[in-house]
Amino acid sequence: MTLQDTVRYFIEETKILPCLSVTCGGAGLCVQARGGVINEQGTPVSDRTLFDLASLTKLFTGLLTMRLWEEGRLDLTRPVTDYAPQYRYLSNMPVEKVLGFEIGLITPERIDTQKTPEAAKQQLWAVQPGEIRGRAYSDIHAMVIRDVIEGAAQSEYGAELTRCILRPLEMAETFLHVPEERRVDCISCRGEHRIEQGKHILRTDAQPGIPHDPKAARLYPEIMGHAGLFSTQGDMVKFAQGVLREQVISKMTIRKMARNRTGFRRADGTYQQYLGTLCYVKHPVQYFSEIPAYESDEAIGLAGFTGQHMSIDIGTGVFTLFLGNRVMNRLTVLVPEAGKSLTDYGLQADGRGSIVWDDGTRVVSSVNYVHQKDAHFHQAVADTLGLPAWRRAGTAWS
């Protein structure tokens, strides 16, 4: 299987994504493929295409935090309020607990439903710690850490990002704010369809160059560290290779990032997510793992809602990059009503297929597309680079 087979599967065979750019390699190797269109006008994906990185932004935030720690400017054991006093309910909470998703963080009201950016900030600053209920992963943790970064550095998030990552790696096509003349190169996120408990939701307000994430959009033009960056395939390759070459932080510090802080097997046999420093880490069950089978437990990775995935492994020296668009004119979320499954709505059990919308149009599904990546992306990477499974099936997990 080749990377072009990956593109063909997602773009042509299943139509899960309207466009896709995939890459794999190492510090000195890069193999790429791409295909599809980025907008309703049919503009082909190219090396100028700007992808909404969504939660891949957290990788930048996590690396930036650890860079400040390496420089001695941030003490992870100190409370959040030492660096960001506006978080009055986190006065006894060490930064490292927030950084590793080791506590639950709850705002009084939803940030994305606030009428103004200032009201949204007030909700964020009123966040309170609590027990983790359900998923440990959340956007709020990275948003808090963004403010911690600014307090520790006595500098704006964007300035520190430029100093520590964007400028050293020559990432000239990675933007916190997309220039007006480059918005034509942005993927379109218009026409997102959702079905939640029988309610049909159509989002038509997404604008090119504005983050798709509702919280990031509400707080824009301020970038809050959890989402909001835009970048090209080429720049993201520079990012991955720069991390592998230790141009951002040391291998020792990356290993610290990759340490599991949350994951465990519950008494009922289910698992809590395996998370590290604002990232996913290796999971013992591959179906639930954002880290591919051929990468080690020194890998860090993330997925972005808009159709993105990245993993970087200093153990094997391999990186993977999946930049797509699962939003434009797609069904992205389907939460079935009680007693129903995806098949009751006309989809296949794995989320593939299409549905007929209220107006009679047929909408292709990208629901649960992430579980297609192992067979149709990571297998292609393994074949391309000649990579065996890092840990044999059935081998005990330490």
What are these regions (language model features)?
Residues 14-21, 40-97, 127-140, 224-227:
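Short active-site loop at a secondary-structure junction
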Residues 21, 97, 310-311, 319-322:
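Structural recognition of the beta-strand scaffold that forms the well-ordered cores
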Residues 91-295:
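Short, surface-exposed loop or secondary-structure junction motifs
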Residues 288-299, 336-341:
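Short, surface-exposed loop/helix-turn segments at secondary-structure junctions
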